[in-house]
Amino acid sequence: MVALVKPHGADELTPLYVADEDARVALQREAETLPSVVISSSAAANAVMMAAGYFTPLTGYMNKADMLSVADNLTTADGLFWPVPILNMLKDVSAIAGAKRIALRDPNVEGEPVIAVMDVAAIEEATDAELEAVAEKVFSTTDKQHPGVANFLAAGNFIVSGDIQVLNYSYFADDFPDTFRTAVSIRNEFVERGWNNVVAFQTRNPMHRAHEELCRMAQEALNADGILIHMLLGKLKAGDIPADVRDASIRKMVDVYFPPNTVMITGYGFDMLYAGPREAVLHAVFRQNCGCSHLIVGRDHAGVGDYYGAFDAQTIFQEKVPAGALEIKIFEADHTAYSKKLDRVVMMRDVPDHTKDDFVLLSGTKVREMLGQGIAPPPEFSRPEVAQILMDYYQALDAGK
């Protein structure tokens, strides 16, 4: 009997996608008659996550009171534990002023089709000072060089809140038909496979040897039935490797180096926030909604630059997440690297006798340089099959310059 962890804040998932085809067609027809507005990429990604059940139990976009409460207390105004405001922020609301029901248009799909219909609860204005205070709490900085802060502060001062009905999954279902999955379908597949105890690995990058072994370590330590490799498919910062390349490299690694039927490779439709500790908690919330019992949280999880301490994304679970707020557990990981002494990948904290020279360590910049020149990183760092896919990508990129 499979008994998965319960969804967050609910007995069942609450996906906001209109699954009934007749109802969806009728809603689409209605949408074309409604006042409409093109929303931000971030707001569209929020709609996709709500559509797919990942953001259970939310029924729509948060209001200003929720935004301020989540930023200050990690709870919505009515007390639901939630780490990051889920917002529809606009610069201009003249097209929807006074409207009670509106159509939301997708900026990421050609022709800007309607992605959702919204019952408008409120249109509220936040001051620049209020938004900066929220950024400070959520991102731990107001520095506009931080990509998440830059996006948040550029989104607009109007907060449009209310329940939504979602018509589609934006570009994710079409562009990533084999990888994009809803929380509903992931949870159902766990049941079909008989997996009770599942460890999730979050990634926005290709997976090298250290990541591969980290998944194995977690699976063995937790006696997990399987691993969910769950990759972000939405927008990243400039210079990050696109989702289709990451997808291909991860699939190759799993095909060659993991036993059959022990790993599920899936993706979710969200734009990276780079919110470090707060985003790590959000990752835990929606992996619980998928049915995962554990989430691997390592060094610099969901971070960028030097904005966060190496283990801030772990300590937030002890310091800011109340007991009982989440059912999912965290598998705390240190940096993993190949030990020349032991001839295997280890967690660096487990080998206090090692010096830096005892590990195969390469910076991201160095790896990018090598791949661009057609030089494979050492096999202790990256599997040759993975390195080949990445070399092909970087060389094509350089050739196109």
Swiss-Prot record:
Enzyme class: transferase
Coiled-coil positions: none
Pathway annotation: Sulfur metabolism; hydrogen sulfide biosynthesis; sulfite from sulfate: step 1/3
Catalytic reaction equation(s): sulfate + ATP + H(+) = adenosine 5'-phosphosulfate + diphosphate
Pfam family of the protein (one): ATP-sulfurylase
SUPFAM superfamilies hit by this protein: Nucleotidylyl transferase, PUA domain-like
GO terms under biological process: hydrogen sulfide biosynthetic process; sulfate assimilation
The enzyme's E.C. designation: 2.7.7.4
InterPro entries per UniProt: ATP-Sase_PUA-like_dom (IPR025980), PUA-like_sf (IPR015947), Rossmann-like_a/b/a_fold (IPR014729), SO4_adenylyltransferase_pro (IPR020792), Sulfurylase_cat_dom (IPR024951), Sulphate_adenylyltransferase (IPR002650)
Sorted UniProt keywords: ATP-binding, Nucleotide-binding, Nucleotidyltransferase, Transferase
GO molecular function ontology, one term from the record: sulfate adenylyltransferase (ATP) activity
Family per record: Belongs to the sulfate adenylyltransferase family.
Protein name: Sulfate adenylyltransferase
Species name: Alcanivorax borkumensis (strain ATCC 700651 / DSM 11573 / NCIMB 13689 / SK2)
